[in-house]
A protein has these predicted regions:
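Alpha-helical transmembrane-bundle signature of multi-pass membrane transport and export proteins
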Residues: 1-423
Length: 423
């Protein structure tokens, strides 16, 4: 008797709603991610330190509440978290164009909105990553992640160019208003999901500290997850510093117009789209395990193009670099996220994802703050070279691990990867 093939996700109603909602939401995130730094630089005259501080506050919540957020999300219905999260972010972001119209916009307000959106995003992202296994079967998880990543990369391709055009036409404040509309639409799509999660049993709750410890223990006790967390955390520490300074660097040191910057980012993001559609083939070619260190090395090395753009032709250098970075990051993420989703028991998914987010996103506000301080003190280009050196080092935990000898990744908790797990 043969096992029937799983139904196509194209015909899966609930996955389609999640997919459409996620796609609209990430388009909105691209708009605000492009427009808010421009607003700070062009309308409020922000310097390197202020740009670093803004980026720090955007991700600070992952460091401060990332761990308890996972335990809380495991106690709530994830669909509700997603719907309310998008609505909350939409309302917060709407205060920026409102303040601009009233001529009362300040850097202080940008900081407050960054913190508020960051707090909501912590809960939203943990619920979002934990929700897919609720809707699809285990063997469909990789396919679902691939489709979600393809949409996200499509948004990254079209988003910056579209945002640049909107900024040119409407200005950065009204472009952020478009983001609010996108997030409202996202909440509408997700609210149409028919699947009803089983309500967590309040009687089964344990002390918050115990649940947090359980999530951390799951991640840190697995030898492969430890390596992946170390690599991702170091990479995020470096890249957050780079990206905190990137818009200021592009507009001042490289003298790029905002439309040129948007096109460079959009064309570079084609690499991520190619990564989303080729990740399965690449994993089969080199092996699931090997795909992770190879993608990490490629994306880390490609970061060299950012400071090199100050001495080489800027546009082609950044374009090639962004193509390679985007491809490597997406292939890496699809492989490692699918691995941990397959490995983790469903009741632990929220805490596991929150623990990993805390460990790998927690360094981001630190990197952004250090990047801003160093950029103000030592200059943009020397700071970027230092951050890129750290990006190269970040691949070592997975490069010097059993992953480089593994074609297949473990799918069971008792298949803890060591040398015996290599194939």
């Amino acid at each position: 008797m043969t096992t029937p093939r799983p139904a196509s996700l194209w015909r899966h109603h609930d996955f389609r709603q999640l997919w459409m909602g996620d796609t609209v939401s990430v388009f909105g995130a691209q708009f605000v991610g492009f427009a808010m730094p421009l607003m700070a630089v062009q309308l409020l005259g922000a310097n390197a330190f202020q740009m670093g501080l803004l980026a720090t506050l955007e991700s600070l919540a992952f460091l401060l509440i990332g761990l308890p957020a996972g335990a809380w999300v495991d106690r709530w219905r994830k669909r509700t978290v997603l719907v309310l999260g998008d609505l909350g972010r939409a309302l917060l972001l709407l205060t920026l164009p409102a303040a601009w119209l009233l001529d009362v916009l300040t850097m202080g307000q940008l900081y407050v909105v960054a913190v508020g959106v960051g707090v909501i995003t912590v809960f939203f992202d943990v619920a979002n990553q934990s929700y897919l296994p609720e809707l699809v079967e285990g063997e469909q998880i990789s396919d679902g992640n691939g489709k979600l990543q393809a949409s996200q990369q499509t948004a990254m391709v079209a988003g910056p160019a579209a945002a640049a055009a909107m900024v040119r036409l409407l200005g950065s404040p009204l472009t952020i208003a478009v983001t609010s509309v996108c997030m409202g639409l996202s909440s509408l799509f997700v609210s149409r999901i028919r699947h009803r999660e089983q309500a967590p049993d309040p009687a089964a709750r344990r002390p918050l500290v115990t649940e947090i410890r359980e999530g951390l223990s799951f991640v840190l006790s697995h030898p492969l997850l430890r390596r992946i967390v170390a690599c991702t955390g170091l990479s995020n520490l470096a890249s957050s510093g780079v990206f905190a300074l990137f818009v200021l660097y592009a507009l001042t040191t490289l003298d790029l117009a905002e439309t040129t910057l948007g096109l460079v980012l959009s064309l570079g993001a084609v690499g991520g789209l190619l990564g989303a559609v080729s990740s399965g083939w690449f994993g089969r070619w080199v092996g699931e395990g090997r795909a992770i260190p190879l993608a990490a090395v490629l994306s880390g090395t490609a970061m060299l193009t950012v400071p090199l753009a100050s001495v080489l032709p800027a546009v082609p250098t950044l374009l090639v670099g962004n193509l390679l970075i985007s491809w490597g990051v997406v292939v890496y993420n699809i492989a490692q996220v699918s691995f941990r989703q397959r490995l983790c028991p469903k009741p632990l998914l929220g805490r596991m994802n929150a623990s990993i987010r805390f460990l790998v996103w927690g360094p981001m506000p630190i990197g952004a703050f250090l990047g801003g301080v160093a950029g103000q003190r030592f200059g943009l280009v020397p700071t970027l070279w230092g951050l890129v050196a750290l990006s190269l080092i970040s691949a070592l935990p997975v490069l010097l691990s059993p992953l480089v000898r593994m074609r297949e990744l473990p799918r069971e908790l008792d298949a803890l990867a060591g040398d015996a797990g290599a194939r």
